[in-house]
Amino acid sequence: MKIRNSLRSLRNRHRDNRLVRRKGRVYIINKTNRRFKARQG
């Protein structure tokens, strides 16, 4: 999982990326291509 300041550019890299908020943190998850996982930090 990558930890990035800005997730907007990462979200646009793959069409299956989803922006998810869990426990006050923002995540990018991708069911089909899991190497795009990221967390904002």
Swiss-Prot record:
Keyword terms: Ribonucleoprotein, Ribosomal protein
Species of origin: Parvibaculum lavamentivorans (strain DS-1 / DSM 13023 / NCIMB 13966)
Entries under Pfam families matching the protein: Ribosomal_L36
PROSITE patterns xref list: RIBOSOMAL_L36 (PS00828)
Gene Ontology CC: one annotated term: ribonucleoprotein complex
Full protein name: Large ribosomal subunit protein bL36
MF GO annotations: structural constituent of ribosome
Family: Belongs to the bacterial ribosomal protein bL36 family.
HAMAP family xrefs: Ribosomal_bL36 (MF_00251)
GO BP term (any one): translation
SUPFAM superfamilies on file: Ribosomal protein L36 (SSF57840)
